[in-house]
Amino acid sequence: MVALLRGSEIEVKAVEWLWKPMIPFGDVTIVQGDGGDRKTTMMLTIAAKLSKGILPPSLEDGLLVDAPTIAPASTIYLTTENKAGSVTVPKFEKAGGDKDFIFFNNELEQHMTLTKEELTEAIDITSYRD
């Protein structure tokens, strides 16, 4: 059975941004693009900065605005394309990341096998936020 909610049943909350207006805190973010677009490099650079408590600048009214610093935070980086040991960890290190603040899936498959419950648990385990 499909579970549906009316809009009137949903509590509206303000978005807390990791990178305004691109990436919200605490949500799954999927990046798609052509090979060679530097998706991995961009996301691992953001994760590396986040591991040091540095947020990317926000885009507000067409201008880049410096974001405040925060406590170092974790990233769960899931991929079906790159191996952690040969691609993602070296790129994360090159960007200056603290390896204690990044977590990777332990499998390289075409399809993710994490259930919603497993992903929620992973976020809870690695989260520094309430």
Where are these regions (language model features)?
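The conserved Walker
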Residues: 35
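Conserved glycine(s) of the Walker
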Residues: 38-39
